[in-house]
């Protein structure tokens, strides 16, 4: 069993760890290619236990219950080509998230 703590500087939505950071933290801890499913908001600044479940998965848990489940595997993606420079500049200037965002602290 391993204890992991998500520092508040890695905040995602309010009072919750950033999902990508949490998944990366689990993968780094296990030193493996894994698929992770978040099943509850990951609490911040709280010791979480990462332990095998006996059925081929690892479970990250808080005192309240499971936070994430991980299993060995890789995600296969067809990565699209990047945009042209002019398109990227235009998109960066017109992205509405710079003016208003559902999770501005994320």
Residue ranges and their predicted role:
Residues 33-55:
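Active-site beta-strand->loop segment that positions catalytic residues and contacts the acyl thioester
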Residues 3-5, 49, 76:
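Ser/Thr- (and often Asn-) enriched beta-sheet segments in non-cytosolic proteins
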Residues 53-106:
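HotDog/MaoC-like acyl-thioester-processing domains
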């Amino acid at each position: 069993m391993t204890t992991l703590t998500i520092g508040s500087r890695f905040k995602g939505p309010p009072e919750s760890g950033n999902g990508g950071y949490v998944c990366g933290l689990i993968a780094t801890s296990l030193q493996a290619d894994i698929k992770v499913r978040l099943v509850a908001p990951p609490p911040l600044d709280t010791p979480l236990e990462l332990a095998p479940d006996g059925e081929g998965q690892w479970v990250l848990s808080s005192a309240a219950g499971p936070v994430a489940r991980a299993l060995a595997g890789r995600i296969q993606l067809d990565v699209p080509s990047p945009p042209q420079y002019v398109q990227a500049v235009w998109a960066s200037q017109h992205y509405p998230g710079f003016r208003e965002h559902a999770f501005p602290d994320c």
